[in-house]
Design a protein with these regions (language model features):
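A feature for the membrane-embedded catalytic helix bundles of lipid/isoprenoid biosynthetic enzymes
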Residues: 1-15, 84-218
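Alpha-helical transmembrane segments of multipass membrane proteins
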Residues: 17, 37-41, 167-169
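A short mid-domain helix/strand-loop element embedded in enzyme catalytic domains
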Residues: 4-12, 17-20, 27-29, 35-36
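Membrane-embedded alpha-helical segments that form the functional core of polytopic membrane enzymes
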Residues: 26-78
Length: 218
């Protein structure tokens, strides 16, 4: 939701400002990486509000660097690896840091709760990435572009930005612990839905042959 409906306009203006000033996409990605580390450290210390500022800044810059690369035609293999590598690796570290920071913020969990919540989030994160890889390899397309409902689901599924919305909302009501529990529950629910989605797609391919994106039929 944030990437599609909130960031496009400010990212457009940021790109238009940066492009003629010699700012490269890799420079933007580097700043985003710094924001990622700062968010992790602040979450770990229980400074959730400050951490969220840097986390949301990172998500914004993650949008800007791609637009800047396309606008200036300066994309590179290294830049692509750098950008996507950060995107792939950092979310689990944020969730772990948030969980560990709850104690410093006065919301300590017992060990059982900690591991159930973190296990659900990290397990769901890894399995969802595997589902995505299976879809690309066996179906020949990314699952979220198969049907309109899949594209819509992509906007709210348990990925970084929707999860940040849950964490931000929980902080606004003064219960950052509830936010991470909400992320765990939403991750498990989305994992089940993604599993059903993948099974439907595999069955459709066996029945109909090669699948195509609904976008190509428009």
């Amino acid at each position: 939701l944030v990437t599609k409906h909130v960031w496009p306009v400010p990212a457009f203006h940021a790109t238009r400002y940066l492009a003629p000033r010699g700012i490269t996409p890799n420079m933007v990605t580097t700043v985003a990486a710094v924001c990622t580390v700062l968010a992790f450290w602040l979450f770990l210390k229980g400074h959730f509000a400050a951490g969220l500022v840097f986390a949301w800044a990172m998500t914004f810059l993650d949008t800007v660097d791609g637009k800047l690369a396309r606008t200036t035609l300066t994309s590179s293999k290294w830049g692509d690896i750098f950008d996507h590598g950060i995107d792939l690796v950092h979310p689990p570290f944020w969730y772990i840091a948030w969980a560990l920071g709850l104690g410093a913020a006065g919301f300590s969990w017992d060990a059982v709760t900690f591991w159930w919540v973190i296990g659900a989030i990290l397990g769901g994160y890894v399995i969802q990435r595997l589902f995505e890889g299976i879809a690309i390899k066996w179906l020949g397309l990314e699952i979220h572009i198969w049907r309109p409902v899949d594209t819509l689901f992509r906007q709210v599924t348990a990925r970084r930005n929707p999860n940040l919305v849950l964490l931000t909302a929980s902080l606004l009501i003064g219960r950052p612990d509830w936010g991470l529990i909400a992320v765990a529950i939403w991750t498990v629910l989305c994992l089940v839905l993604h599993g059903l989605q993948l099974m439907q797609a595999l069955a459709a391919k066996r029945r109909l042959g090669q699948l195509t994106s609904w976008m190509t039929a428009r």
